[in-house]
Amino acid sequence: MAQSTLYSRVLGTGSYLPPDRVTNQELADRLAKDGIETSDEWIVARTGIHARHFAAPDVTTSDLAFVAAQRAIEAADVDPQSIDLIIVATSTPDFVFPSTACLLQNKLGIKNGGAAFDVQAVCSGFAYALAMADSFIRTGQHRTALIVGAETFSRILDFKDRTTCVLFGDGAGAVVLSASEEPGILGSALHADGSYSNILCTPGNVNRGVIAGSAFLHMDGQAVFKLAVNVLEKVAVEALSKAALAPEQIDWLIPHQANIRIMTSTCRKLGLPQERMIVTVDEHGNTSAASIPLALDVAVRDGRIKRGQHVLIEGVGGGFTWGASVFRY
């Protein structure tokens, strides 16, 4: 008897935002105390962001990941001990090592010895992690994967730089992916170009117990915008081609929630109506690797994304990295 083709499909989603919601006006008031001028109108006009969430000083990235993971596991209705692969996409890990994924595995009480590791592709991290987990499952190496995007970007923001500190927030999103004979993940594409590493980076490093270089995020906004709008359409089309789907067959587009102008530009280039694009950047800000699974969970739980629908995710981030996946939910 011929062996059936193995696929991976999304069983459940989850997300978590720390309770400290900071509006643009509240952030502007904080910055004004240090002589930094900005306003709600200025931020909204350039980014579409109205608010973001910041984690408390004693809350770690793995803490955020833990809650999102619990919610995804509950939604998937799986035994945590059946999860034999954990991938955490983050650029703000708890420690230099061990990985946030190992810390999360322990917090979840998973004792089966399954693989656990982090992926560092910044805002493309979740797209990278999802594609990697899909490959592991399709080849039979693992059967049930927990993929988490989690960030505490507030820890690396320079609050004297209004061009970056107004953009980012903290949060986590998660999905449970499981082996299935029914197609789920239909096509993925991943890319990087290290020659653009300087346009979005946090260049500091630990050297003999001292942070060498800047530990703050640095960004050339214009260069990032120009590159992002160019590569996102191309990688989306590539993933669609691998999935044997046309753009008009996509029910929902979930772009990395970086900036409403980048998001709408990609949506327009793909010929999709704006109504099919999931937008959470207005309330969450840019949560880097957490932004796509956060938006996915919001749209699943409010009933917009339904079983059987086609979803296209795409992300672009520091590195420079970019990626996309198409899946049937």
Curated annotation (Swiss-Prot):
**Which residue positions are annotated as catalytic?**
C123, H256, N286
Question: Where's it found, cell-wise?
Answer: Cytoplasm
Pathway(s) served: Lipid metabolism; fatty acid biosynthesis
Q: Which GO terms describe its molecular function?
A: 3-oxoacyl-[acyl-carrier-protein] synthase activity; beta-ketoacyl-acyl-carrier-protein synthase III activity
Q: What is the documented function of this protein? A: Catalyzes the condensation reaction of fatty acid synthesis by the addition to an acyl acceptor of two carbons from malonyl-ACP. Catalyzes the first condensation reaction which initiates fatty acid synthesis and may therefore play a role in governing the total rate of fatty acid production. Possesses both acetoacetyl-ACP synthase and acetyl transacylase activities. Its substrate specificity determines the biosynthesis of branched-chain and/or straight-chain of fatty acids.
InterPro entries associated with the record:
ACP_syn_III_C (IPR013747), ACP_syn_III_N (IPR013751), FabH (IPR004655), Thiolase-like (IPR016039)
User: Looking at the record, which segments are called ACP-binding?
Assistant: 257-261
Leading EC class: transferase
The reply on keyword Acyltransferase is: yes
Task: List the catalytic activities from the record.
Answer: malonyl-[ACP] + acetyl-CoA + H(+) = 3-oxobutanoyl-[ACP] + CO2 + CoA
**Protein name, entry field:** Beta-ketoacyl-[acyl-carrier-protein] synthase III
Task: Note the Pfam families from the entry.
Answer: ACP_syn_III, ACP_syn_III_C
Q: Which organism is it from?
A: Burkholderia thailandensis (strain ATCC 700388 / DSM 13276 / CCUG 48851 / CIP 106301 / E264)
Query: What family, per the record?
Result: Belongs to the thiolase-like superfamily. FabH family.
User: By its UniProt entry, which Gene3D superfamilies does this protein fall under?
Assistant: 3.40.47.10
A GO BP entry: fatty acid biosynthetic process
Q: What is its EC number?
A: 2.3.1.180
Q: Which GO terms describe its cellular component?
A: cytoplasm
The intrachain disulfides are: none
Free-text comment on this protein's domains from its UniProt entry: The last Arg residue of the ACP-binding site is essential for the weak association between ACP/AcpP and FabH.
> Main localization of the protein?
cytoplasm
Keywords on this record? Answer: Acyltransferase, Cytoplasm, Fatty acid biosynthesis, Fatty acid metabolism, Lipid biosynthesis, Lipid metabolism, Multifunctional enzyme, Transferase
Q: How does it assemble?
A: Homodimer.
Domain of life here? Bacteria
Disulfide bond is among the record's keywords: no
